């Protein structure tokens, strides 16, 4: 669960809760950021010595989706942290169709199928950064496939010195995108370019 501070019109601050269902090996977990890493033996699995969790659920993901639906906690997401989570993610989406976003391994070829399985929106990061470099072409293609209203671009960052850099692949790989006021202005220009380009698609 994430508590995001928001400001009322009268200047007072309040918290808006964003429910999360983070899945690792089919189980709901709260993992300490940056501790989910690939194993060094080339097996394709996770490094068990690096992984640190704050919470490992005994209930299935569908339980939490049903709980969020009962309390009308909107704006939540289901994140698949690695392989082996598709079935668990689908079970959560089915409990509250069109109200939970889905992320983790989303790309051009599977985005629509997750919408069809009940996701309100798809969340994407790694697909937009081939070789860790941002691809506007991929973003436009994905927008055309699912529609802008169904697409969320995750720019989770890691700090390096005084900079915040967008990270991908379970926060292991740093991309070429820095988050700053200057980058925001450039992204606004890119967004205008994307608007013009998408109109001609």
Where are these regions (language model features)?
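N-terminal active-site wall of soluble small-molecule enzyme domains
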Residues: 38, 42-46, 57, 61-117
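A short acidic, glycine-rich active-site loop
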Residues: 41-58, 172-178
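N-terminal basic/disordered segments at the start of proteins
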Residues: 9-26, 30
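Intrinsically disordered, low-complexity terminal segments enriched in Ser/Thr
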Residues: 188-200
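Solvent-exposed alpha-helices and their adjacent loops that cap or buttress functional pockets
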Residues: 8-12, 70, 94, 143-146
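Conserved anion-binding
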Residues: 24, 29-36, 110, 115-189
């Amino acid at each position: 669960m994430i508590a995001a501070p928001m400001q009322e019109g009268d200047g007072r601050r309040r918290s808006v809760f964003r429910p999360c269902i983070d899945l690792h090996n089919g189980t709901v977990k709260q993992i300490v950021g940056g501790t989910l890493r690939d194993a060094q033996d080339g097996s394709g699995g996770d490094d068990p010595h690096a992984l640190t969790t704050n919470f490992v659920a005994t209930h299935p993901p569908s339980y939490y989706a049903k709980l969020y639906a009962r309390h009308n906690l909107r704006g939540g997401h289901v994140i698949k942290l690695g392989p082996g989570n598709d079935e668990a993610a689908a079970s959560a989406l089915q409990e509250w169709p069109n109200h939970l976003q889905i992320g983790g391994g989303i790309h051009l070829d599977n985005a629509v199928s997750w919408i069809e399985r009940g996701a309100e929106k798809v969340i994407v990061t790694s697909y937009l950064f081939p070789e860790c470099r941002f691809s506007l072409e991929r973003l436009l293609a994905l927008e055309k496939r699912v529609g802008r209203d169904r697409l969320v671009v995750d720019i989770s960052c890691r700090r390096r010195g005084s900079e915040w850099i967008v990270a991908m692949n379970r926060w292991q790989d740093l991309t070429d995108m820095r988050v700053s006021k200057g980058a925001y202005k450039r992204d606004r220009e890119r967004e205008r370019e994307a608007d013009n380009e998408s109109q001609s698609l």
